[in-house]
């Protein structure tokens, strides 16, 4: 066993900024790579990688060699889940635990408000490269998206954001 083992170099991904640190990567079964950086997860596509920012990763599942990531799209301050993307990892290295740790560390606070016969979840998350936290809302499944619900969301987001701004 060599005292100083040669470290593998991460794959080159177009779009990665000069000050962006590669945290981990994994080789996929189709010859691509999933790369985790300080800004998020670079997901392989047909032509190029695309960035899924840490603050937009809603859910990560690692099972049977497959990593699946559900990205949330922001629409009018609401987090709306996109369809999950998944990849079979040939060589996962430490990518799954690194991604899990980063996603968990990104969520600062979460609370649920009962409104309109349903519920809305409010989530404060860190945004890489910005100070403080940013609040978003997610209408929980089974809750109707009505004017009453939207008004409650707007009021609560304004209060939470004012509190966050005051604590900086």
Name every feature range the model reports, one short phrase each.
Residues 1-168:
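Eukaryotic intrinsically disordered, low-complexity regulatory linkers and tails enriched in Ser/Thr/Pro
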